[in-house]
């Protein structure tokens, strides 16, 4: 598979070998990206390899990884969040992993020192990684587990306990479910940019409410009954004055999972109603701030929503790829 690509690379870089391993169907590549498996090859990236790239462990030192935010309405609360720059990098590293649910490509002994980042484009690529085209469920699971360990140790030096709860759930998912939850991992809510979180939630909500509920009511009901959400979510909402105004604008039944989702949807859609102080003509918050307020009160609800859809093979139908470019 793609042997001509590997041979041409060996010719371009005499110091690198690209010969097949003694085992049928297994190969070694000096530098590969997901494009290799569809016959593509970005020559510019690899021509920069000797001098214009850094190992992942060095590149992350150039990036601000976290920042602290104070969601409006929570004067004494500060949240540590991931920066968009580090989210972009982790999304791109994940994009190097072929989808084990649709592709039979798997890597052997994937380590942090296999991952380099092009300094001009900021795109990561794999260097000297071995792969096989034979399906192996253990390798599928192991690939994502090892990438998760890269995130944990190489990027955050093991200090993940203070990081956002949804990101910790992503790491847990990568450790145990890489063979079955690849789409949920690649498009996880913890890696969405702050400004896109509303779009992510509303796409998932609208698919579930407008399509799935009519198409397969049993699956819809099963998902709603399986959602994890704070038992006192309505009380948590009313600890924030801006969320309280939105909560009081409708009637909600606190014991139903779908009501939590309905509140989040309404809060996103109508959040700008109370975003300005009419007396001072000053903006109080924007849609990204609303996302932080909702995450403070309703942590892990979106993670649970994504996961329950993915368990049933439904998350793919929403086509979230455009939000994770």
Language-model features, listed with the residues they occupy:
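Generic preference for well-ordered alpha-helical elements
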Residues: 42, 53, 83-94, 141-144, ...
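Long, polar low-complexity intrinsically disordered regions
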Residues: 6-13, 20
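Catalytic-loop of the protein kinase fold
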Residues: 88-119
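C-lobe/activation-segment region of protein kinase-like
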Residues: 33, 109, 118-184, 205-246, ...
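Regulatory extensions appended to serine/threonine kinase catalytic cores
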Residues: 197-325
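Phosphate/adenylate-binding glycine loop and adjacent helical scaffold
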Residues: 189
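Conserved structural core of kinase catalytic domains
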Residues: 15, 22-87
């Amino acid at each position: 598979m793609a042997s001509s690509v590997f041979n041409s690379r060996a010719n371009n870089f005499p110091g690198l070998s690209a010969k097949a391993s003694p085992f049928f169907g297994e190969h070694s590549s000096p530098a590969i990206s997901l494009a290799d498996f569809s016959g593509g090859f970005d020559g510019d990236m690899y021509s920069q390899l000797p001098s214009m790239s850094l190992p992942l462990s060095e590149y992350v030192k150039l990036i601000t990884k976290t920042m602290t935010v104070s969601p409006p309405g929570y004067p004494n609360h500060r949240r540590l969040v991931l920066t968009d720059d580090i989210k972009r990098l982790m999304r791109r590293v994940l994009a190097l992993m072929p989808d084990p649910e649709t592709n039979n490509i798997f890597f052997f002994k994937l380590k942090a020192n296999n991952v380099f980042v092009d300094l001009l484009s900021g795109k990561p690529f794999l260097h000297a990684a071995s792969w096989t085209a034979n399906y192996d469920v253990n390798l599928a699971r192991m690939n994502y587990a090892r990438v998760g360990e890269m995130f944990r140790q190489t990027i955050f030096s093991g200090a993940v306990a203070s990081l956002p709860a949804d990101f910790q759930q992503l790491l847990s998912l990568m450790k145990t479910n890489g063979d079955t939850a690849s789409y949920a991992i690649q498009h996880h809510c913890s890696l969405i940019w702050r400004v896109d979180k509303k779009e992510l939630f509303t796409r998932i909500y609208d698919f579930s409410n407008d399509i799935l509920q009519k198409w397969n009511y049993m699956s819809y009901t099963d998902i709603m009954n399986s959602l994890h959400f704070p038992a006192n979510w309505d009380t948590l909402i009313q600890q924030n004055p801006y969320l309280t105004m939105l909560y009081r604008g409708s009637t909600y039944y606190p014991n139903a999972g779908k009501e939590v989702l309905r509140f989040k949807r309404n809060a996103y859609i109508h959040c700008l109603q109370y975003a300005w102080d009419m007396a001072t003509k000053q903006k109080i918050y924007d849609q990204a701030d609303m996302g932080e307020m909702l995450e403070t009160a309703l942590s892990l609800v979106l993670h649970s929503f994504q996961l329950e859809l993915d368990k049933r093979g439904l998350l793919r139908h929403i086509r979230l790829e455009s939000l994770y470019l």
